[in-house]
């Protein structure tokens, strides 16, 4: 997947997860001469990828905005897109003094942050967010359902996705990308939104748009959605709780809870909520926490008596997930395989799990803050399992050469990116590649050396095997 492309704003927003305007592509994606907007350039990317038989999976964020407001819900800034240096947040972001106050420019950075936050979630004891576009929840526990309502980081201000106005706006904005032809969504921080909310507010809506605009996608393939239900834990069930486990999101929510879900703006306008209080509204958040029934099981992933059988998707939510339990056990292929065999019946269909060894966030346990540190032989074994087992293989850039092996993935703003697992990989792929067939090519420049790496060659062979054997796909 490619990381989010909507307009961002923060002091650390290179990755796209701090939205300030969901309705447009970030101005930093405009053409070098400024004649083509980011939206036009992104459409060109989709079209050119499709012309080469490549699908575009777009990372989207439903859970939160950045901490600089949002153009539609709380306009705190104007952006000067004419400035070449868009990384200089103080120069390109012009504060809306009507919203932030005339004294805002003279405040120290920490107080400026608190002022911005107060306008979004009532942290100063005043009811600024009268329509409840954001959640106003204080302390939370990563291992309890109240993680659905809380701000998980200073630059990730939690949206009230139970509010129809918020959900409808997000569906409209991201629906525009479906109309442009993106082939699927990877949905960030899905584990910080309840399953009930997904089933009521997002999955059916995106699925309907996907069906409506199927002609825009490569080969009219079904629109694919999968979520990041983060579970940094060694078992398939997350700390004894079904409703916080990735597999739970692959199943439909109960009909009685769906029928009782009323996120109308007229309701939310009656709620006055502060994070110094309970942080809960009168009915929607408690209703979501009632979605905690035991999860069913399925044999959709398995053959029966050595034969294929028609899968039963009658209880599928239409949503798939990143296989966090498998990812977390990829310290060895044997450990990952054993875990999957013991737990795949918990997913509606684990065939659609997205599987990776490491990512831009985590590596396998026990040291999940670093990129996979194993040898090339260990990498090759893990990749062999990924490409010949159930699920959809996913590679983080550079894994094909063991790039930044063992490096700390995210040091925040405390050091250059070049010293982290998120370092720039572009230098490895400069040069030219001319493909004559699947896995057959001629290359020159740095990319030739990259493709000649032992792991890259192993991946080419695995891809050829997977392409030749339909059962593996």
Task: Identify the residue ranges that each predicted region occupies.
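Conserved oxyanion/phosphate-binding beta-strand-loop segments in alpha/beta enzyme cores
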Residues: 1-7, 136-142, 337-346, 350-353
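Substrate-binding/active-site clefts of carbohydrate-active enzymes
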Residues: 4-180, 201-212, 224-238, 243-319
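Short hydrophobic-aromatic micro-motifs
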Residues: 155, 355-357, 394-396, 402-403
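Short, well-ordered beta-to-alpha junction loops that form the rim of enzyme active sites
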Residues: 5, 60-61, 189-190, 358-359, ...
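Active-site-proximal helices and loops of the catalytic beta/alpha 8
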Residues: 46, 50, 64, 172-179, ...
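Active-site clefts of carbohydrate-active enzymes
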Residues: 155, 350-373
